[in-house]
């Protein structure tokens, strides 16, 4: 299959050819891209191809779901997250999925393609929404378990909404952190208070390896920062729960004081995908406030050997069938120590991106071309992952729910699941410090 860079360039050229009739005497598609005629044609093409239309599934639980963004401290040392939560109603407008064009430019950089690819992606997906009520009021009257969520390499806070919304619909508050360690394709902060007041964002883009630079030191340093950012996000949310006055730098309509006395402080977990899965492991080893963790298709390369024995909390690995490889599984198995609660399942026919919203946002052709979809239906894959997660969370957070109806999924008992792993590690000589299993882009 073609590399993702060639995929993106192929799609770009195809779109340009369809909407811009090439005149080889006057070929200037970059100048033409801003014209109303070009935009109109590309939008017609999108409609015909069924691209960029919201298909992100609604939550399957009984709660309506709200969504907002929170930024505490405008600097790049502060906390930035997207919050999903049970809401009083869902009559607010749906949430814009990817809210700034710079995220698309960051994704094009992550793919190693021309910035024009980011422009086209913005046209495809820039108006797409996700089914959560923007700035809706928190549903009051009960305390909710809290989940901190960590995104993968090249991702950002908004593109795991299918997971966040479903968990919130089952009665969780989910805080999806946007990391400032250089692993997000894009993120932003403000340089000073005056920049905040006029909305002048300072953008941080993906930190790439320099020529001759070793990867492990960079990724391990990023991993440690990610873990600190997850713990910092937890501390801030618990401060709000205690009634400490805080200001959301983004000055949205959502009243942060609603969160006072809303958190069940004994029921806190962490979930993450890929690099975020490694972040789950690092965070559990450092912060005992997290009662358990779930690593979705974890990329284990950044984890130092000293960490594996320092995780007393229950840990659940949910893997895709096509991403994992022997050295990565060997690292996971280092976590399986005596008297430690560990579980692992693999979703048959799934790919790494089955955990990311792009698997729902694209047609079958585009999905298969970019490996955003596997052989399994995307809705089935995310449903299995979410239900197994809920069952695991009920057991280890002591929830009084009915999620134990899915206990069998935690054991891999379903025709779409494999107990443990599909990867054979027998006699595999893993050279762990020189692994070639680099995490693929979230559009791969």
Swiss-Prot record:
One Pfam match: PAF-AH_p_II
Gene3D superfamilies: alpha/beta hydrolase
Post-translational changes noted in the entry: N-glycosylated.
Glycosylation sites: 60, 200, 424, 434
One of the GO biological process terms: platelet activating factor metabolic process
Localization: Secreted, Extracellular space
Reaction equation(s) it catalyzes: a 1-O-alkyl-2-acetyl-sn-glycero-3-phosphocholine + H2O = a 1-O-alkyl-sn-glycero-3-phosphocholine + acetate + H(+); 1-O-decyl-2-acetyl-sn-glycero-3-phosphocholine + H2O = 1-O-decyl-sn-glycero-3-phosphocholine + acetate + H(+); 1-O-dodecyl-2-acetyl-sn-glycero-3-phosphocholine + H2O = 1-O-dodecyl-sn-glycero-3-phosphocholine + acetate + H(+); 1-O-tetradecyl-2-acetyl-sn-glycero-3-phosphocholine + H2O = 1-O-tetradecyl-sn-glycero-3-phosphocholine + acetate + H(+)
Tree of life domain: Eukaryota
GO cellular component terms attached to this protein's record: high-density lipoprotein particle; low-density lipoprotein particle
Keyword Lipid metabolism: yes
GO molecular function, one term: calcium-independent phospholipase A2 activity
EC main group: hydrolase
Keywords carried by this UniProt record: Glycoprotein, HDL, Hydrolase, LDL, Lipid degradation, Lipid metabolism, Phospholipid degradation, Phospholipid metabolism, Secreted, Signal
Signal peptide: 1-21
PROSITE patterns according to UniProt: LIPASE_SER
Active site location: 274 (nucleophile), 297 (charge relay system), 352 (charge relay system)
Tissue specificity note: Plasma.
EC id: 3.1.1.47
Function per UniProt: Lipoprotein-associated calcium-independent phospholipase A2 involved in phospholipid catabolism during inflammatory and oxidative stress response. At the lipid-aqueous interface, hydrolyzes the ester bond of fatty acyl group attached at sn-2 position of phospholipids (phospholipase A2 activity). Specifically targets phospholipids with a short-chain fatty acyl group at sn-2 position. Can hydrolyze phospholipids with long fatty acyl chains, only if they carry oxidized functional groups.
Family: Belongs to the AB hydrolase superfamily. Lipase family.
Name of the featured protein: Platelet-activating factor acetylhydrolase
Native organism: Bos taurus (Bovine)
Lineage of the organism: Eukaryota, Metazoa, Chordata, Craniata, Vertebrata
Gene: PLA2G7
């Amino acid at each position: 299959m073609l590399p993702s860079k060639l995929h993106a360039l192929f799609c770009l050229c195809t779109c340009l050819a369809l909407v811009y009739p090439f005149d080889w005497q006057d070929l200037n598609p970059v100048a033409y891209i801003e014209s109303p005629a070009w935009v109109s044609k590309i939008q017609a093409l999108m409609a015909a191809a069924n691209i960029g239309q919201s298909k992100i599934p609604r939550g399957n639980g009984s709660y309506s779901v709200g969504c907002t963004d929170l930024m505490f401290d405008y600097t790049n040392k502060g906390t930035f997250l997207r919050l999903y939560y049970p809401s009083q109603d869902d009559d607010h407008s749906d949430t814009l999925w990817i809210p700034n064009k710079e995220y698309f430019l960051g994704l094009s950089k992550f793919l190693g393609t021309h910035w024009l690819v980011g422009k086209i992606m913005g046209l495809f997906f820039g108006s797409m929404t996700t089914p959560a009520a923007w700035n809706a009021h928190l549903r009051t009257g009960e305390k909710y378990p809290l989940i901190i969520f960590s995104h993968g390499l090249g991702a950002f806070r908004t593109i795991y909404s299918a997971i966040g919304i479903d968990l919130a619909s089952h009665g969780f508050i989910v805080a999806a952190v946007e990391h400032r360690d250089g692993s997000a394709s894009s993120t932003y902060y403000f340089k000073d208070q005056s920049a905040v007041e006029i909305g002048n964002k300072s953008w941080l883009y993906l930190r790439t390896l320099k020529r001759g630079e070793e990867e492990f030191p960079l990724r391990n340093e990023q991993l440690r920062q990610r873990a600190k950012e997850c713990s910092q996000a937890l501390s801030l949310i618990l401060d709000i729960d205690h009634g400490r006055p805080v200001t959301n730098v983004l000055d949205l309509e959502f009243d942060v004081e609603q969160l006072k006395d809303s958190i069940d402080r004994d029921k806190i977990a962490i979930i993450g995908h890929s690099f975020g899965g490694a972040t789950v492991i690092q965070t559990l080893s450092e912060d005992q406030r997290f009662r358990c963790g779930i690593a979705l298709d974890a990329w284990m390369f950044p984890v130092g050997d000293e960490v594996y024995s320092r995780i007393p909390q229950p840990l659940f690995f949910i893997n895709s069938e096509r991403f994992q490889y022997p050295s990565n599984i060997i690292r996971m198995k280092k976590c399986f120590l005596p008297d430690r609660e560990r579980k692992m399942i693999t979703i048959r026919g799934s790919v790494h991106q089955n955990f990311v919203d792009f698997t729902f946002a694209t047609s079958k052709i585009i999905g298969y071309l970019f490996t955003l979809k596997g052989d399994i239906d995307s809705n089935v894959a995310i449903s299995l992952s979410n239900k197994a997660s809920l069952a695991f969370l009920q057991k280890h957070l002591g929830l009084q729910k009915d999620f134990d109806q899915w206990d069998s999924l935690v054991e891999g008992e379903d025709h779409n699941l494999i107990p443990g792993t599909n990867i054979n590690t027998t006699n595999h000589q893993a050279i762990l410090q020189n692994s070639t299993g680099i995490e693929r882009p979230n559009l791969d």
